[in-house]
């Protein structure tokens, strides 16, 4: 079986030839099917640039990114757009819900774009809503929902298309601690029960402790990685803090 994600010798430069900034420096790592991986690093470490390259929002300067064996750095135009729609699910810090659509319509939109039949759309939206405990908000508009509810709607939108990979960028960044915990429990459910493969960028150690593996980036390079294994979430949290201390920077920002 192909790995869900393979990043090989990735490099990304910004700026002109006279003043180049290297955001990613010869970075390589893999993500296995049904794995939940967190990416951590200080501000400016390259983690957001990495996610942008994987999501095809940005093109790498060099290197390759494979999703289930397909080199997405070679895709262009409509083929790239179709791949992004069908193979990726996105969860953003600021939800990215359309204010003029209900929760149901926001979730269904991802399937409508793929020309899925109405009966199938309804079935899949209802299932995703049940999985993420948001059936009671399906007829509500974003302004009528709490931040936690909006992020669970966004998560349902991400999972409803059954993507190969869910990409989450600071998904708890706009949530309070209770809403964050509820969302992360749903991430675990998506990963363990729905077999979703998740790659999550976060600065928050508590959020990262829900992952099965944490990859640490420093100055655009792979600094270290740790696996949860049989460790409890509390023990894994402690291991994450230990690595962040070695990584440098203000550990309090990650608490």
Language-model segments: residues:
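A short, proline-enriched helix->beta-strand linker immediately N-terminal to the Walker B motif
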Residues: 160-164
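Conserved ABC transporter NBD signature motif
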Residues: 63-71
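Short coil-to-helix segment of the ABC ATPase nucleotide-binding domain corresponding to the Q-loop/switch region
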Residues: 101-109
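Conserved ABC ATPase signature
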Residues: 141-145, 149-151
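Hydrophobic anchor residue at the start of the ABC signature
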Residues: 155, 183
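Helix-to-loop junction immediately C-terminal to a conserved catalytic motif
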Residues: 55
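Catalytic Walker B motif of ABC-type/P-loop ATPase nucleotide-binding domains
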Residues: 166-169
